[in-house]
């Protein structure tokens, strides 16, 4: 997660209530259905944290309350809301007298069963549970849940089928490829079966035996066909086949008279059968990301349908029959090919959410005034030049997103949308923000980035509920004073404008948490910023700032400070007073050294000093034991030639980027950085990798492309954590360049292992050549060159032991000593050849050269 995303998450906490209210009224998911069905109402309970028995289907539908312009800063919570299609089932049944509190009271009893079935060895030893054992475990007439998610199961645990009282069975995220062998008496009470993410290729015909099944989830598998026997599941209410390989819509589903929710999103459907209207109870239908080229008319005759998702298809028009969807509340058709909207769509008087982003719409009809219940309208990424004034009749509208169109102005009467909370008009041709926007008393999020706006009306100060404002990349000359009067404003971005001065009024915005002013015309770090004692994130990058005021010490909450691409020539010591600072970016300045006071930044985690003018590596950085990420690459700055051994003091370092320098070697103690996960050292002059590099057991990314490496260490395959490697653009001989091109560690490791074996054999042959051909005089000279003492080579029976044997024994001793230095067989060979050359053993050299030529000609 980036720092911006982290701050956005803080802001999302503030507006979570708004989102929750908006979503609960928008009818986007089955949980928002305001009907009497317990099944549907439970999903709504889930969103409020009430439901106790749920399973989830993951899918990539977009969050309807987030503009595409802010997608880069969505919080994790929003990502989950984008992906989840909730489905739930009530644990209270007609005729069941047990209350929820009673069930909770018996948790300890049935937890024994869950623990027993969830044992680590369950994949190897199937549990045998007799009726007597079931009683001992407390299995009675209760609604028991068995959760075996991610237990490494290779096959369906058949013995579970014999347990009478299991009602909810979760087997997600295993490796169950199929399940068969059920008998007519098995799992008679099973109501929920979830087999997501297992690699299932099909469903067995025995599925029909699960007569009481109400929810079946087999999403994220490899299923290409739905068996006809599924039509026998008369009690089924929810079916989830999301993200499979289904090409034909299962016609047998028409027999499922109680089906309420059907998810077939992300399959390969091209056609919907005309028999679909037989599903008269269907309320929620997901067909997103299929291959539909037309809007299936059969969908228009589902009388109870309230939510329809056709996102990501190839639909170019809507049929007139769409008017028959009288109860439809949510229609999602983002990422299609729509060029116009059939006028009949405006007869859907109950519509509450309409998403049409990323189409080719040029006009919206004035009949939009019919949508009196509309809460959410998403029209991003179309070709709209104007929005009809009649949109002001959509009095319930809460979210209006119009980004990435061709709008020059807002609708005249937009101020009548009293319930509007989000207005996003990014990347259009807006020249100004109309004064009447000040009447939007409930507005919380306002985004106008990427337009040609020159100023912001002072009247915006009346919008006292605004939390977030985006005005980046416009033509604003002066900091908008009206923004300084917004007491609820937490997030403000005015990047990419022409602001040169900061007014004193900003010092009153003490509630600000996140402020972005990069790419403006600021010459100084204004002291008015220093009054923002709650500010956590400040981006002043790409300005012309040269120094920092001493009063910055007042910014006690500051966690992230971006000062890249400014005019700093010396490191601002004033920054060292920011005890809570976690992220500092001073890249692309003119820094030559760093103050030793930087050690006062006790909580610093991320530093970016790339593209500066350091003469040497700033050794002061090595004091920062809390540092996790360091970037000192110099693509634009002065090149570093060496790294200090003290680098190993940064014991918490996880990411190190030393790329684009002139570094010749990696410190020999690099292995002491035990937490290192990512090492980027590309485009340097490194010719050798120290053995301690192989001690980095957590290393996942290693980029050494563009260096002078001729060989890789044989034991590199021992770094089991490595996931990404890059040795491109090195003069590699061992292994050859073509072996490394695929960036596959297994391939490289296999080559090196075989090369090691080959080098050992060659070295032994060289030993024999030397031993069989060396003279007594040359042998003595060779021992001297190899630093072998006479005591190591003299033998008590020298007169009876041949010169050949003594020479071979000496070479073995030399090899044993050299192995302590972690020298490879190839390195030993090269040393021996140099020594033979120095003593003038040319005849032996000729024989070794012939051997080398012969072995290179043989592929292994």
From Swiss-Prot:
InterPro entries assigned: DD_LRRD1, DEATH-like_dom_sf, Death_dom, Leu-rich_rpt, Leu-rich_rpt_typical-subtyp, LRR_dom_sf, LRR_domain-containing, LRR_R13L4/SHOC2-like
Keyword line: Leucine-rich repeat, Repeat
GO CC aspect terms: cytoplasm
PROSITE patterns in UniProt: DEATH_DOMAIN (PS50017), LRR (PS51450)
Keyword Repeat: yes
Segments of skewed composition (Polar residues): 50-72
Pfam family, one: Death_Lrrd1
LRR repeats, residue ranges: 139-163, 164-186, 187-210, 211-233, 235-256, 257-279, 281-302, 303-325, 326-348, 350-371, 372-394, 396-417, 419-440, 441-463, 465-486, 487-510, 512-532, 533-555, 557-578, 579-601, 603-624, 627-650, 651-673, 675-696, 697-719, 721-742, 856-860
Highest taxon listed in the record's lineage: Eukaryota
Any single GO BP term: signal transduction
Record PANTHER family: CASPASE FAMILY P20 DOMAIN-CONTAINING PROTEIN, PTHR48051
Protein name, as recorded: Leucine-rich repeat and death domain-containing protein 1
Species per Swiss-Prot/TrEMBL record: Homo sapiens (Human)
């Amino acid at each position: 997660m980036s720092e911006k995303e982290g701050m956005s998450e803080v802001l999302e906490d503030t507006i979570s209530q708004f989102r929750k209210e908006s979503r609960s009224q928008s009818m986007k998911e089955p949980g928002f259905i305001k009907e009497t069905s317990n099944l549907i109402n439970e999903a709504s309970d889930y969103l409020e944290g009430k439901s106790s028995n749920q399973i989830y289907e993951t899918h990539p539908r977009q969050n309807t309350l987030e503009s595409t312009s802010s997608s880069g800063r969505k919080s994790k919570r929003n990502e989950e809301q984008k992906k989840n299609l909730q489905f739930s089932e009530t644990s209270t049944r007609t005729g069941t007298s047990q209350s929820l509190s009673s069930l909770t009271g018996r948790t300890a009893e049935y937890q024994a069963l869950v623990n027993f079935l969830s044992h680590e060895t369950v994949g190897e030893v199937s549990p045998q549970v007799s009726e007597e054992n079931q009683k001992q475990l407390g299995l009675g007439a209760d609604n028991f849940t068995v959760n075996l998610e991610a237990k490494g199961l290779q096959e369906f645990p058949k013995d579970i089928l014999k347990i009478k009282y299991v009602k909810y069975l979760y087997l997600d995220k295993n490796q169950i490829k199929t399940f068969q062998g059920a008998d007519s008496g098995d799992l008679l009470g099973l109501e929920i079966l979830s087999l997501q993410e297992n690699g299932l290729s099909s469903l067995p015909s025995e599925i029909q035996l699960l007569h009481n099944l109400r929810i079946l989830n087999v999403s994220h598998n490899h299923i290409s066909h739905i068996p006809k026997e599924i039509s026998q599941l008369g009690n089924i209410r929810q079916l989830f086949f999301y993200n499979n390989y289904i090409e034909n819509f299962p016609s047998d589903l028409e027999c499922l008279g109680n089906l309420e929710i059907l998810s077939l999103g992300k399959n390969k459907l091209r056609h919907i059968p005309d028999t679909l209207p037989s599903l008269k109870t269907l309320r929620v239908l997901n067909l997103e990301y299929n291959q539909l080229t037309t809007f299936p008319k059969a969908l228009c005759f589902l009388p109870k349908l309230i939510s329809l998702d056709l996102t990501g298809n190839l639909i170019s028009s809507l049929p007139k029959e769409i008017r028959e969807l009288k109860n439809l509340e949510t229609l999602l058709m983002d990422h299609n090919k729509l060029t116009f909207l059939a006028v009949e769509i405006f007869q859907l008087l109950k519509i509450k959410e309409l998403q049409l982003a990323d189409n080719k719409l040029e006009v919206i009809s004035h009949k939009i005034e019919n949508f009196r219940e509309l809460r959410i309208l998403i029209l991003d990424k179309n070709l709209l030049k104007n929005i009809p004034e009649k949109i002001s009749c959509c009095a319930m509208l809460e979210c209006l997103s119009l980004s990435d169109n061709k709008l020059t102005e807002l609708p005249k009467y937009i101020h009548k949308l009293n319930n509007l909370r989000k207005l996003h008009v990014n990347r259009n041709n807006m020249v100004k923000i109309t004064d009447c926007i000040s009447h939007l008393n409930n507005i919380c999020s306002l985004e106008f980035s990427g337009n040609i706006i020159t100023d912001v009306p002072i009247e915006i100060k009346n919008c006292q509920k605004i939390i977030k404002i985006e005005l980046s990349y416009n033509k604003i000359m002066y900091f908008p004073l009206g923004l300084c009067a917004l007491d609820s404003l937490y997030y403000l971005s005015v990047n990419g404008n022409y602001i040169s001065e900061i007014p004193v009024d900003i010092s009153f915005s003490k509630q600000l948490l996140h402020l972005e002013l990069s790419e403006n015309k600021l010459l100084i770090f204004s002291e008015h910023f220093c009054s923002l004692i709650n500010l956590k994130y400040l981006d002043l990058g790409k300005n012309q700032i040269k120094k920092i005021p001493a009063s910055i010490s007042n910014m006690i909450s500051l966690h992230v400070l971006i000062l890249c691409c400014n005019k700093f020539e010396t490191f601002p010591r004033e920054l060292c007073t920011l005890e809570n600072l976690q992220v500092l970016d001073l890249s692309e300045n003119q820094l030559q050294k760093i103050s030793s006071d930087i050690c006062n930044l006790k909580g610093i985690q991320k530093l970016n000093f790339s593209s500066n003018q350091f003469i040497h590596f700033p050794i002061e950085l090595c004091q920062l034991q809390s540092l996790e990420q360091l970037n000192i690459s110099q693509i634009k700055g002065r090149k570093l030639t060496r790294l200090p051994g003290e680098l190993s003091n940064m014991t918490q370092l996880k990411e190190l980027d030393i790329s684009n320098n002139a570094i010749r070697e990696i410190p020999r103690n690099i292995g002491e950085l035990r937490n290192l996960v990512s090492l980027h050292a590309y485009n340097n002059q490194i010719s050798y990798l120290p053995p301690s590099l192989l001690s980095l057991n957590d290393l996942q990314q290693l980029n050494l492309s563009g260096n002078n490496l001729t060989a890789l260490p044989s034991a590199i395959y021992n770094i089991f954590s490595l996931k990404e490697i890059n040795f491109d653009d090195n003069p590699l001989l061992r292994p050859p360049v073509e072996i490394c091109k695929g960036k596959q560690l297994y391939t490289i490791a296999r080559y090196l292992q075989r090369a090691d074996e080959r080098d050992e054999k060659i070295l032994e042959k060289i030993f024999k050549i030397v031993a069989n051909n060396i003279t007594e005089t040359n042998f003595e000279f060779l021992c001297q060159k190899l630093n072998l003492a006479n005591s190591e080579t003299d033998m008590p029976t020298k007169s009876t032991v041949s010169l050949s044997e003594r020479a071979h024994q000496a070479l073995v001793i030399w090899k044993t000593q050299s192995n302590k230095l972690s020298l490879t067989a190839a390195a030993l060979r090269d040393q021996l050849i140099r020594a033979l050359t120095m003593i003038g053993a040319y005849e032996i050299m000729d024989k070794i050269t012939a051997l080398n030529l012969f072995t290179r000609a043989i592929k292994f």
